[in-house]
């Protein structure tokens, strides 16, 4: 009996503990590293094609290695609702009959009624605001910029990690060298937390078991 109570107590404590959840990895998202081939030029000349800036340019990113500031303006909202109702009623009555010339005092009635009323709703809303500076990784043949960047904030009780990658049109970059995240094609934005604060918001293993699809109740 004592062993059973001890096991029950340990299981109850395990449901309250915070076990580290699997975190998404921060791989390079299949983006190759920046590789800029040096332009051929004369040695000792005043003009260098690699580091030269045009007098008519406005400082916007346009070549591998340039930085670009992305303004995060992500808002998603989804909702779903379903209502189902149906019913069925049935009645049957048996009146007195005649058997062998005599009236049988048999009178009865039956009735059945079934109703179903079910409904469900689901909603989700996410908002992400902020800024992150990325680096131009590659310039495609059509002038599309392939960018990627990472920002890590180390706090006293954890760590916040943000990563962004995608493709940017040069025409969408403003004169301040900024672009909205809504204008990034194939955008992959990751924002996760690590540490004590993130672990405190995670359910224990026993709680996750009771909330899993394996529970028949």
UniProtKB/Swiss-Prot annotation:
A lipid is attached at residue 16 (S-diacylglycerol cysteine). One of its GO terms (biological process) is bacterial-type flagellum-dependent cell motility. It is found in: Cell outer membrane; Bacterial flagellum basal body. Residues 1-15 form the signal peptide. One of its GO terms (cellular component) is cell outer membrane. A lipid is attached at residue 16 (N-palmitoyl cysteine). It is a lipid-anchor. GO terms for molecular function: cytoskeletal motor activity. Keywords: Bacterial flagellum, Cell outer membrane, Lipoprotein, Membrane, Palmitate, Signal. It holds the Pfam family FlgH. It comes from the Bacteria. InterPro entries: Flag_Lring. NCBIfam families: PRK00249.1-4. Belongs to the FlgH family. The basal body constitutes a major portion of the flagellar organelle and consists of four rings (L,P,S, and M) mounted on a central rod. PANTHER family: FLAGELLAR L-RING PROTEIN. Assembles around the rod to form the L-ring and probably protects the motor/basal body from shearing forces during rotation. This is Flagellar L-ring protein 2. The gene is flgH2.
